[in-house]
From Swiss-Prot:
Tissue: Expressed by the dorsal and submental skin glands.
Protein's name in the database: Citropin-1.2.4
Keyword Secreted: yes
InterPro entries for this protein: Aurein_antimicrobial_peptide
Pfam families for this protein: Antimicrobial20
Biological processes per GO annotation: defense response
Amino acid sequence: GLFDIIKKVASVVGLASP
């Protein structure tokens, strides 16, 4: 769902900017 995409993006951003 859309929320899953948001979580995935948030995870990528979190890894990129810890």
